[in-house]
Amino acid sequence: MLLVVDVGNTNTVFGIFENGKNVPLFHKRTVTRKDRTSDELGLFFRGFLREFKIENEAITGGIYSSVVPTLNPILERMFQDWFKIEAIRVHYQMKLPFSISYPRPYEIGADRLVNAAACVIDSPGKFIIIDLGTATTFCVVSEKPEYLGGVIAPGLKVSMDALTRNTSQLPPIVFQSPEKILGDSTIESIQAGFFFGWIGLLEGIIREIKKDKGQDYRVIGTGGLVTVIDAAHPGIFDKIDPLLTLRGLQILHQMNS
């Protein structure tokens, strides 16, 4: 079995794949803690595996993507000590199913490489891949396939937290789809501002990318909030795939083993 781990700034998502399968048996999301030791991580993952009656010895492969460099050596030691394997770290110099047209390819986040890999292998074509995470990222992949570049905007939750943290009278809120554009209270007004503001951001950037690159790019959505956005405002995405990153990790492990 294969253990895949995607370490984001806010959340860490991980899953278990049976050898050769491209859909995870199990997956889970947890808060990224930068103060964890390798043993704490090992205990955490062992507990997760035992929920599903899987012993550590069943894990024969590991791969991780990370945008938190300080956690990389901790993860690698965890894989070594607890699973007796050398995990593969995602980076731009590994085998990828696409080329990179980018002056400084080392700047591309590992999560963006993983998402692009999943899209290219799933159904070759032209893609705009949107990941709604701590940051809102747009990645553009041509049909060659070639990674052309992207757009990075603030993440929704980061922006909401910044607003309430830097204002005296605005309360923290939970992001949800409002019933109407005009709020009847402070909370409803903030919810409307963020929801419709983010819809405008997504649609506006997609429009500008298509104006520059062509209209025949498919828009693929992933990330923690993609199902909320798609359910409340369908039509932005041609396809949503909350498990895109995990499947991309499985693909890159297969290519680099």
UniProtKB/Swiss-Prot annotation:
Annotated residues that bind K(+) are located at D131
Q: In which pathway does it act?
A: Cofactor biosynthesis; coenzyme A biosynthesis; CoA from (R)-pantothenate: step 1/5
- Broad class of the protein's primary localization: cytoplasm
Catalytic activity entry = (R)-pantothenate + ATP = (R)-4'-phosphopantothenate + ADP + H(+)
Q: Where in the cell is it found?
A: Cytoplasm
Q: InterPro entries, from UniProt?
A: ATPase_NBD, Type_III_PanK
> What is the stated purpose of this protein?
Catalyzes the phosphorylation of pantothenate (Pan), the first step in CoA biosynthesis.
What name does the UniProt record give this protein?
Answer: Type III pantothenate kinase
Q: Which gene encodes it?
A: coaX
